[in-house]
Amino acid sequence: MSSDDEGREEYLFKIVVIGDSAVGKSNLLSRYARNEFSANSKATIGVEFQTQSMEIEGKEVKAQIWDTAGQERFRAVTSAYYRGAVGALVVYDITRRTTFESVGRWLDELKIHSDTTVARMLVGNKCDLENIRAVSVEEGKALAEEEGLFFVETSALDSTNVKTAFEMVILDIYNNVSRKQLNSDTYKDELTVNRVSLVKDDNSASKQSSGFSCCSST
């Protein structure tokens, strides 16, 4: 290892992906981390995670992304996994209005179990199913503005805005951490577990940014 590598700063951020069951959380994560999609994916049992690496301002940033089960009977178990999270994607299915109506409950749970400075992204998934849309883009934007969230619609099926959604959250966390100087050894130790690092395409965020809708009160 070179001296440059040894002296290189490293950040490790925990991000949770939350929302009702079957909104596509697991497929969003697998599309982002492994560029995979499963049309017959089963409901997540418990919690799974992937780690993705990217470079920001010459620093290595690793996002440890946790996929929490949406089924009600698992919520008490997964609540412990909010601990240490500095980012969250709150996902609903644009074809199922009930999942959009549940967003407020998920945001309340996030507020209870995490810090108020968590970077939050509202994600309307399955935008490839425009012909059976039940929640308009305008409704998603309005809720995001009301709650002070970033907002984007995605499709795990065709990859639309998937990288953009995750990387906007990661960048916002990085900016928050840089400002508050939270990159302490204690903070990093809290989030360190066995993981697999995956390297992103450096140009991917810029390529997809044109399709991104951002709504924030800050």
Curated annotation (Swiss-Prot):
Its main location: membrane. Coiled coil: none annotated. GO terms for molecular function: GTP binding; GTPase activity. The keyword Repeat does not apply. This is Ras-related protein RABA5e. It comes from Arabidopsis thaliana. Transmembrane segments: none annotated. It is a lipid-anchor. GTP binds at residues 19-26, 67-71, 125-128, 155-156. Intracellular vesicle trafficking and protein transport. The keyword RNA-binding does not apply. A lipid is attached at residues 214-215 (S-geranylgeranyl cysteine). Residues 216-218 form a propeptide. The gene is RABA5E. One of its GO terms (cellular component) is plasma membrane. It is found in: Cell membrane. It holds the Pfam family Ras. A motif (Effector region) lies at residues 41-49.
